[in-house]
Curated annotation (Swiss-Prot):
Heptamer of 7 subunits arranged in a ring. Interacts with the chaperonin GroEL. This is Co-chaperonin GroES. GO terms for cellular component: cytoplasm. Its main location: cytoplasm. It comes from Citrifermentans bemidjiense (strain ATCC BAA-1014 / DSM 16622 / JCM 12645 / Bem) (Geobacter bemidjiensis). Together with the chaperonin GroEL, plays an essential role in assisting protein folding. The GroEL-GroES system forms a nano-cage that allows encapsulation of the non-native substrate proteins and provides a physical environment optimized to promote and accelerate protein folding. GroES binds to the apical surface of the GroEL ring, thereby capping the opening of the GroEL channel. It holds the Pfam family Cpn10.
């Protein structure tokens, strides 16, 4: 992907939702909710403070993150769906 986010924005790829339940039932596309977690694929340089300094983002490429239901803007790049959001939209990082 050839897109570099600016300032405190990050690009996230949603994780794929399962199409079957643990009991073996098929979940149709219309019944699925979009997952609220994903993987960071690109990060900006950071947010510029009032003092003029750039404060780096606490996330790195590859981090698994949780975000709000309405966070970010959906974009399609090279046939794949991504979310562009601000660092403030991230609720937490999933630790391994």
């Amino acid at each position: 992907m050839n897109l570099r986010p600016l300032q405190d924005r990050i690009i996230v790829k949603r994780v794929e939702e399962a199409t079957m339940t643990a009991g073996g039932l098929y979940i149709p596309e219309t019944a699925k909710e979009k997952p609220q977690q994903g993987e960071v694929v690109a990060v900006g340089n950071g947010k510029r403070g009032e003092d003029g300094k750039v404060y780096p983002i606490d996330l790195k490429v590859g981090d698994k993150v949780l975000f709000g239901k309405y966070a970010g803007s959906e974009v399609k790049l090279e046939g794949e769906d991504f979310l562009i959001m601000r660092e403030d939209d991230i609720l937490g990082v999933v630790e391994k």
